[in-house]
Structures are given as C-alpha cells and as structure tokens.
C-alpha cells in the first residue's frame, strides 16, 4: 500500500496527483482554486540532514534569481506560520508533465526532437555559465518537459558559483572530508571531476550535456559505469585513453595521472560507427563535447552556434546572463560550521525576503 503523503498547504490549493519523489522531497500536481491553474508543488523536509538544508537553500536562491524560459519557474514559496513549527518547505512552481529520462525510455525521438531538446538544455546552460553558475548535476531526469516539448532545467541543489578572481574553484579547504556533497550521478560526471578531488568549472556541465546528447541518440546511457574504475574504462573506451604528458596536463594530481597510465590503452572509437543512423553534424557536436581536456571542450555558447543546431540557433534570443558574485552562496564557505538551526534561519530569511 503506498504511503500517505501529507501536504500542509494553503486551502487555496487542491492536490491532484503524485508526480515524483526523491531523497528529501516529493512533487505533486495541484489546482490553484482561485484561478483554476494547475501547478506543481514540491514539498521538501530539509532539516533531517544539513546536506538537505544546504541543497534546499541553493535551490531556492537560484530559482528566485533566474527568470529564463529553460529554467523552471517558481511562482511562490509558502510562508510558514512560525519558526518553531517550520519543518517543511513548499515550493509552488510551473507544472511540467514529464522529464527527459522518461521521454527517452518510452519513445523513439526524431532528429528534430533531439536537436530541440539539446538546444534548450544548452540555452539554459549558457545563461547559467554567463551568470557564473555551474549546475553540476545535469542529467535527463533533471530536464523537465511539458506537452509542447518545452524543456526546463531543475534541481539546483548541487550548484556552485564560480569565483573568477580565485586561483581555482574547489571546495573550501578542509571541507572535502566531513560534509562532502558531490553525489551527482556518476554516469554524467566529467572525467576531471572523478580524477581531481573537488575542482569544478563550466566545462563539467558541457561534458554532462554531451552524455545527454549521446543518450538521446542511443536511447540508453553512454557511460553506465558500475563503479569508479568501470566508469573511467567506459569513457576511455570511447574517447580513447589519454597517455601523453600533453594529454594529461589538465590533471594536476600526480597520483591521478599515474592511475590513468595504469589503465588499458584504448584508441578513440569511431563514433560514426557507433551511431550509424545519426546526423553527422550531431556526431561532430558530440565529439566536441566529450573531450578529455576541459580546456579543449566546446563551451555552451559555442555549442549553440554549431551547425547541428542551426535550425533553432538565434543569437538575439540566447541570453548571456549577468555574473553573480561569489557572496551569493556565501554560506558555502563556512558550511561545516553551520548548525541545523543556522540553516533553518537562512532558509526562513530567503523565503521571507
């Protein structure tokens, strides 16, 4: 028997059906009785674990900031009655009927559909990157789709702000052991993220987009690794094992470089044989996304300009985004010291600001 889901929400809403559930929240559709509009309401119980609260705080801040056609829109966040009884967060957002994971697994997609879905994904990533935001968890289930095939990126709980003035962008020192958060799905994780402790850059999102594009072509994940080693073997089995010092210079850790050298030496696989019925322009874009060296990987802006997406590309309708300062996620710099009550206060302030 399914468990009963309780929503403590305004009487203005009538719950309809369960849309999905994850580790720390559920999403239901609901009717807004005064207007008749059908919305999605995400219920989060963030105070069981500090990591859940941090993810919720990032999600709220990001979604309040962005107003973009390919990023999920929030209409409102229900205001709790009192701080003492504040145990749940209710985010009211636009209703999307499904997600890309479900679409891929249930139907064949035309090349035009594939172009449109990856175009919209990259259009969102371009504005995020122009705003100094890295999503860090792009995957088909985080790309919501409606009946018009409109696509919206969701789930910003692992997002980070890039500090352009910093020598590198990694988790603040000492925070990689205790409150480690990088739990993004391994299958979409860039090789440099797997091989280097906690650094991150815009290029890691582009790798994830490449994995998504390949999955649109194959109708299954391209790198479904069972574990860390298997994941790298699958990646190198397709892009080739990097072996020269020039290939490996993007990996700073000597230990990681030695580990790569210990792996089997695979040549790059010819993608046109792997994808015999795929538009050659699509294969060319994929090859530019799945590049080992993040500095040589195509950017989201460049990908939008690629011939594969020329049907949809419009330079006047692909916003760049305004840079967000690192202070936007200031709490990430001292998150180890934050108590649950501290995080509760930060989320409370964000809801009421």
Swiss-Prot record:
The modification Phosphotyrosine is found at residue 182. Its cofactor is Mg(2+). The modification Phosphothreonine is found at residue 180. Its main location: nucleus. It is found in: Nucleus; Cytoplasm; Periplasm. ATP binds at residues 19-27, 42. It holds the Pfam family Pkinase. CDD domains: STKc_ERK1_2_like (cd07849). Activated by tyrosine and threonine phosphorylation after pheromone treatment. It comes from the Eukaryota. Dually phosphorylated on Thr-180 and Tyr-182 by STE7 in response to pheromone induction, which activates the enzyme. Activated FUS3 initiates a feedback signal, down-regulating phosphorylation of both, FUS3 and KSS1. One of its GO terms (molecular function) is ATP binding. Belongs to the protein kinase superfamily. CMGC Ser/Thr protein kinase family. MAP kinase subfamily. Together with closely related KSS1, FUS3 is the final kinase in the signal transduction cascade regulating activation/repression of the mating and filamentation pathways, induced by pheromone and nitrogen/carbon limitation, respectively. Phosphorylated FUS3 activates the mating but suppresses the filamentation pathway, whereas activated KSS1 activates both pathways. Pheromone-activated FUS3 functions by inhibiting the binding of the transcriptional activator STE12 to filamentation specific genes while inducing its binding to and activity at mating specific genes. The TXY motif contains the threonine and tyrosine residues whose phosphorylation activates the MAP kinases. This is Mitogen-activated protein kinase FUS3. The gene is FUS3.
């Amino acid at each position: 028997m399914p468990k009963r889901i309780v929503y403590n929400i305004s009487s203005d809403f009538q719950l309809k059906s369960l849309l999905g559930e994850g580790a720390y929240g559920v999403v239901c559709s609901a009717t807004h009785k005064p207007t008749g509009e059908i919305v999605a309401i995400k219920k989060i119980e963030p105070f069981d674990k500090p990591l859940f609260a941090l993810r919720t705080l990032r999600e709220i801040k990001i979604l309040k900031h962005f107003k973009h056609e390919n990023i999920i829109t929030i209409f409102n966040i229900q205001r709790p009655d009192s701080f003492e009884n504040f145990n749940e967060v209710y985010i009211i957002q636009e209703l999307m009927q499904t997600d890309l994971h479900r679409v891929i697994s249930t139907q064949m997609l035309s090349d035009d559909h594939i172009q449109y879905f990856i175009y919209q994904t990259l259009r969102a990533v371009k504005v995020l990157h122009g705003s100094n935001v890295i999503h860090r968890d792009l995957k088909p289930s985080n790309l919501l789709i409606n009946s018009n095939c409109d696509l919206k990126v969701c789930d910003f709980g692992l997002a980070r702000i890039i500090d352009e003035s910093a020598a590198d962008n990694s988790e603040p020192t000492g925070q990689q052991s205790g409150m480690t958060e990088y739990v993004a799905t391994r299958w979409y994780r860039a090789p440099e993220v797997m091989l280097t402790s906690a650094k991150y850059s815009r290029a890691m999102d582009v790798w994830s987009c490449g994995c998504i594009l390949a999955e649109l072509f194959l109708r299954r994940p391209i790198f479904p690794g069972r574990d860390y080693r298997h994941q790298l073997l699958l990646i190198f089995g397709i892009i080739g094992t990097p072996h020269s010092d020039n290939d490996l210079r993007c990996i700073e850790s000597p230990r990681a470089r030695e580990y790569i050298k210990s792996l089997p030496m695979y040549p790059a696989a010819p993608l046109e044989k792997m994808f015999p019925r795929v538009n050659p322009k699509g294969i060319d874009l994929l090859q530019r996304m799945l590049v080992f060296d993040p500095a040589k990987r195509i950017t989201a802006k460049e990908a939008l300009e690629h011939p594969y997406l020329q049907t949809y590309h419009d330079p006047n309708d692909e916003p760049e985004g305004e840079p967000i300062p690192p202070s936007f996620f200031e709490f990430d710099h001292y998150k180890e010291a934050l108590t649950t009550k501290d995080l509760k206060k930060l989320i409370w302030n964000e809801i009421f600001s």
